[in-house]
Every structure is written in structure tokens, then in C-alpha cells.
Amino acid sequence: NVLELLAMSFGEKKIQVEDVETAIFRKSLKYDKFGDNHYDILSAFQKSIRGSDVDASLHYLARLLESGDIKSPIRRLLVIASEDVGMAYPQAASIVKACVDSALMLGLPEARLPLAQAVILLATAPKSNSGILAIDAAIADISGRDCGEVPNHLKDAHYSGAKEMDRGTAYQYAHNFPNNYVKQQYLPDKIKNAVYYEPQGNKFESSLKKYWDEVKKNK
């Protein structure tokens, strides 16, 4: 039990009430590793990062690590980098992956260092959920309906007889045009006007939108 373990660790040193309370608390953290409270903490962890509260994010990371769980926060961090930061700071995904790899190689307690770095980065980064909205819109659009064939000019033309079937013959190679762009249809006819990605107002996405608006305005 807790008292026996404390007695073995403290030896002849007097055990204080706060020592017992701390030991019981840490034991309860480990016991609840897969309980409802654990998933509440995981939920609060992601929502705190999404809400850009760096201190709350570190608090919940600490509670997860003290429970002995390293894999759950790692999975959440990888998701958050794409779901909640996303196109506002695309480099976050590779930086977080590097931190995660370091944490897995180091193990606890040193793993807390790269994980804290990843949490601080994500919590303080600009946010965008344009990526998840875009892919979910695309998936919803194709669910339960025929969207049509790939346009002929985009079809594979690397086999004998392809040209006779008009496959790939009208394709325009974008790199042969100014700004590496040429206007041509890429979506199937049935959904040729579909729009899935809507850039959000952060600095990075705004700069991309400005660039492409300028390139495409005279096409």
C-alpha cells in the first residue's frame, strides 16, 4: 500500500502528511489512466490548445504525463497540428512530429521537454481549421452519388492506344505557362464548379489568396 511504499522510500526520515497526500494523488492519477476523468483531461488538453491558452495546455499536459500516459497526448498533438493550427502555420506539423519523435526516443521523464515545446508552439500559433472543413466538404460531396468521370485530358496516357481514345491529348502542362499556371478544368463535369477550400483570415492563408487572386484574375 501507499504507506508501506513511503516507508521503504523514506527510510528513517519522518513521513509528513503532505507526503502521503502527494503519494495518494499520484497513485490515483495512474489508476485513472483509462478512466472517464482521463478522457476529460484529454478533451480539455486539446480544447485549451485550440483556445490558445498556453498555461492551461501545459497544466493538462502535466496531468497526463503524471498519470504515466505519453501516447495519448502525443496523438492529440499530431492531430492538433493539422486540425486546429493547419494552414495558419503549416510548418507546425513537421515541428510537432520532430518533438514527438524525440519524446518517444527519450521516454519519461525527459519526454516532457519536447512535448512541452510542442504544446507551447501549438497553443501560441495562429489557428485555422480550413483544412478539416475542406476535406470534410469534399468527402460529403462524393458520398452517395456519382460525381462523373475524370476529364479526358487528365486521364493516364502512358499506354499504347491512349491517344486514339483522346486520353490526355488536350492536357496543358502548367509549368509551360507564366507563374506556372494555366486555366483548365480539373474536376469532373458534374461537379466542375465545386468549391471545398475557403482560405481563412490568418496571415499565411491571406497571402496565398492574394497571390492566386492576382495570378488568376486575367485568366
Task: Give, region by region, the residue ranges found by the protein language model.
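C-terminal helical "lid" of AAA+/P-loop NTPase domains
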Residues: 1-11, 18-25, 43-47, 58-63, ...
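Short, exposed beta-strand "edge-strand" segments with a Pro/Gly-rich flavor and a Y/T-containing core
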Residues: 9-15, 145-149
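Short amphipathic alpha-helical boundary/capping segments
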Residues: 30-34, 46-50, 103-105
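Terminal-proximal interaction/regulatory segments of ATP-powered molecular machines
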Residues: 51-181, 188-219
